[in-house]
Amino acid sequence: MGKIIGIDLGTTNSCVAVMEGNKTRVIENAEGDRTTPSVVAFAEDGEVLTGAPAKRQSVTNPENTIHAVKRLIGRRFDEDVVQRDIKEMPYKIVKADNGDAWVEAQGKKMAPPEVSARTLQKMKSTAEDYLGEEVTEAVITVPAYFNDSQRQATKDAGKIAGLEVKRIINEPTAAALAYGLDKEGGDKKVAVYDLGGGTFDVSIIEIAEVDGEKQFEVLSTSGDTFLGGEDFDKRIIDYLIQEFKKDQGIDLAQDHLALQRLREAAEKAKVELSSSQQTEINLPYITADQSGPKHMAIKLTRAKLESLVEDLVERTIEPCKTALKDAGLAAGDIQDVILVGGQTRMPKVQEKVKEYFGQDPRKDVNPDEAVAVGAAIQAGVLGGDVKDVLLLDVTPLSLGIETLGGVMTKIIEKNTTIPTKGTQTFSTAEDNQTAVTVHVLQGEREMAKDNKSLGRFDLTDIPPSPRGVPQIEVAFDIDANGILNVSAKDKATGKETGIEIKASSGLTEDEIERMVKEAEENAEEDRRQRELVEARNQAENMIHSTRKSLSDLGEQVGDAEKQEIESAISELEQVKDGEDKDAIEQKTQELATKAGELAQKAYQQAGGGDEASADAGAGETASGEQKEDVVDADFEEVKDEDGNSRK
């Protein structure tokens, strides 16, 4: 069985890890980094870039570079938080036919899971390159406060990326696993404060030894799925726009290119101010007017930054209070505080956490990698590599139904350990009624309209009876992923009643299948494109090295021989810019053979003897290989040069 990998699918950055024996390993991507920007860019020629290459070109292509799409996953277009993002984001956020928030790039509308799938594919291929085998299964993390729609959308993203999501795990819980797996010293209660790029969570977790098994039990969780580092960056951007307007009289708020440069500068300044007291934001040629180009040079102090984001930091404390209250604990009952998410590197955040919990947070947990490491541990548990670990997570929000008067009646309370089941018995409101519609909700508000609608469930085929007589038991079943399933039974007959779920949002199975197919086709096209580029590069190298050899050998090459080689070069030049990879490789090989013969002859003339033929043969082999050996230029002409110098 292949490895199950652990993926932290973040708003700003993503990370992948795997269990190796009893150790976890965070895997570096193709760029050599342990985290990958959660950025996907769509170029005009149809090319799709993911990660660092996508982020690098964002300044010149802001409208088609999608970042922070996790903030939209599983959300309705009409939600206030989405409407707020529409004003902030350089790319288009559009309303899908089903009312969900989708994005648009290069004229194509895409669901957020479709975009997130690109990042997951990058994580998948990063793991495959390292492991040397295909990866088909993963544990993916989500913010603890994600609702049912957001969790389902994350599973959909995994499916589109070609991954079977074995488990959805909450980010703070994953961080606690990473922290607590190898810790000795008895039972303890820890608070995980997770302030990432787009979301904030806090979980209170009890780590205990029970019959030789390490048990991680989530006591409570709380948070805000629209508060994170992106909001901190936005405060800096707004400040820079305001200062520039004051100084130059020009408003940069409507200039997408300028905004993208400001976004990068704000992120960089924020990071720098975590370790220094002051930084300068220098952006030459940020814009221009009739008088010429304008440059931005603004000093930003740590104190100023802290005053700009003070209320955002303060906003994280309320969920901490809620989580402690729900767990029945006081701040003094917490033994350790773990910080997760890049934004927790900000000194002001650390100071606030210390002030509230009355202790210094732990410094031995990497805030960028802990979540992926925890996901890999959970993957190890599921794959049987990790023994004696039990994880007991909770549902973050209450589940219930709409009852008479538009009230929400809770069936499963928030912070209930999952998997769990809750039942409610319904009846009919009218005589001979054969169907009942049940409106399922998720949230903590009293009125149904103020909570998240998960769907309407039609119970059909009820035998005609006077009103109030039929007894229909509806069971709400939350699985270990925190995703809701529903079943119903007519108590009078014992017959199971099928429920057709008409989801108020989300992707249909057909849409997911289409996206899976497109993703597979894109992966195939991407591979074909890469191989074509490699073949062209190889052809270019072969032409260059052969011409260099001809030039170096000069008079030693006869006219007929020279003409034959020039003809082979010409034939290769004719095909190398085309789309036929096989033709390019064939002509490259033909030229390589002739170049090898040329090299052999030169060596023999120089007194190289039989060694030359072995070297020439090696040259030919190298010419046929893929990217790892794109040092074709080294294989013969270097030796030719040596040969010439010895002559």
UniProtKB/Swiss-Prot annotation:
GO terms for molecular function: ATP binding; ATP-dependent protein folding chaperone; unfolded protein binding. It comes from the Bacteria. InterPro entries: ATPase_NBD, Chaperone_DnaK, Heat_shock_70_CS, HSP70_C_sf, HSP70_peptide-bd_sf, Hsp_70_fam. The keyword Chaperone applies. Residues 545-564, 602-647 are annotated as: Disordered. Acts as a chaperone. Belongs to the heat shock protein 70 family. This is Chaperone protein DnaK. It comes from Halorhodospira halophila (strain DSM 244 / SL1). The gene is dnaK.
